[in-house]
UniProtKB/Swiss-Prot annotation:
Gene Ontology CC terms: plasma membrane
Keyword Endoplasmic reticulum: no
The keyword Ion transport appears for this protein: no
Identification of the protein by name: Uncharacterized protein TP_0593
Subcellular location(s) of the protein: Cell membrane
Membrane topology of the entry: Multi-pass membrane protein
Main localization (coarse): membrane
Covalent S-S links between cysteines: none
UniProt keyword annotations, A-Z: Cell membrane, Membrane, Transmembrane, Transmembrane helix
Biased composition, class Acidic residues, residue ranges: 533-546
Organism: Treponema pallidum (strain Nichols)
Amino acid sequence: MHDARTFFMRGSCTYAHPVAIGRFFPLSSPTHTPQGTLMKSHGTMCSRNALLLPRRGAGLHVLTPRIREARPVNTGVKVILSLFATLVLMVGVFFCAPRASFAEFERHFYQPTVLSALSTNLREVSKASEAWHSRYRPLFSQFCALDAVRSSFDPAQKAEDITQRAREASALLSSVAGLKGVRIVEAQKPNIHFSTFESDVLLADSGSVTYRKYNAEEHDVPLQFLGEHSPEPKVIIDEYHDALLYSFPSLGNYGEYRGRILFYLSLRALGTHLIAENKLKITDSIVPLSADDYTFGGIVIGIPHEGVRSLKPSVLAEWKRKQFRVQTVRSEQHEDWALLSNASGAFVIAQAVPVLLFGFTPLTKGLVAMVAVVTTFLLVFQLLSLRQDPLTKLRDRLIHFHAQLLHSCLEQKESLEWEEVRTRLEHRRRETDAEMKKSLPRRLRIRRGRELDALLSKGWDDVFSTLEHGYGGARAMNRAQIEQLVREVLAQSLASGEAVLPVAMRADTADEELDEVLEELPDEAASLPSDSSPEEDLDPLEEVESIEGTAEESTREYAAAGDALLSKTPQLSTHSEYVPATLAELLGRNAEPGDVVRDSAVLEYIEGVFDYRPCCFYESHAVHDCLEVVTGEDGPSLSPMESIVSTEDGLFTIRVSKEEGNHLNRDFKALVDSVLY
């Protein structure tokens, strides 16, 4: 047997057991109204989906169930799932094989990128060097073709030839940047016939100059490697002079081969040119390397001189095989270098970079790991977001559909009659909603049917409410203005995605749940008194006495139950779109003293105001119970702050004197909002 403290939970709502309700307030036959199924008992009515509990004092406490709608997966859930998937993937990759993961990433992605950038820069350096090298060849050839230069091998030379040869050599030295000097060497004997190097001069007077023997100090390039008997110029890397040695053939007056003319061009001039062309950095050094037979050679950029000497054998071996691939070498200081080479016409140009440049630093590894985590998270989140919420699609369709529907209803009219428009829209409402739902998948209609109905109903109700109450001039608006208005209203009301269940849906749900509870009642529940008929006309004074007696008995039982019942009360939220009226309009019609409110119009008014929340707590008092609340010294002075008393958990009570009236109009909602909000 259940008593007044018997409760059970269903969903997210708290319900009082119907047996306890029957003991406090006998239930009788239901009455059906347009707003839902109502229950009558002793002249007081409430909605079927609202359960009545006794309060301390007179009256009844109405407990309104709150229906929780199923919501789609929101962004927060997607973020949590994405983070979890990312964490699992990163743990598997970076903790199971951290070294292999970074090594593979470096080998397949990072190293090719670095190598491509270095190779591109090296090709640019080679092109600039070749252009610089080719620019001076014509100047050297012109010097070799001079008669004064050709006659340098004659036994008896004219004074004017000696003077002109010296003058032309000085002009060449001043015009070619980085030109160290010029030598004319005999082919058969190591004799120097002309030189601009002061170290080569042994004796000089006004008529003649005596030069030393070529290669006397054993640091010059041997004659046999200068390209003897070769009619073509030859470029040699001279490590001792840190220069490019241009060896041109010297021909006699009759075209016979006589010797070689040597031009020494400094490598520093090449470095200065490359820096000016923005191909090298100022800190980059240029080191020459040449084979022992001077058949090939080149320059290395980016490594100190002392480091190159130890790398010379391995580097020259690669150059000799003409395999210009990436080469890893180690210096005497145990430093690993990566060498990139490129053939540039007459010689090879190589660039040396530390091997560490091809690997990740600890900071770079941390950055790569962070980027990988963020990228994985975004990919998983995008996969979870690929499928658009069907309700969002339906919302977009509603925005366009309602405007088109108005257009079809008013296609033949210049001025609008709002009642006619409303009638047409109401006529098409059910049919249109059915077609909308039919276009959605069957599984969606079954699982989220309430949300679909709520979304459709919310769209229609907001349009009607706004056109009727918020825009009183709708009758004079043209068709374009109506369409724009509907679009704005739907976009604002549906964009939030919070659809509220209509009254009928909530009432039906509560009916089903209450019927299930009644089926579970023991047989004793059937014997509860329910002989009060809604059509029975009782004397007003008898009804007052009956209600007061019931209230006193309920108060005693409620006090025994304790305050735990109130702690289960859900909050009833309200919102208003109406402007509060004067106090005289709030009370409606007057009634005789001692009357008890039992007209169904009271509940109809309340349900009309609370269109999506059909239940509220209405407390009736006799005249002597509320004179101190309703009346003042000079007569009735009802005010919102005095007539509405806020109770626990957001429910409220209105105390109305029978002299002031027994009907509540729609402005009762505005009165409630003025106090609670």
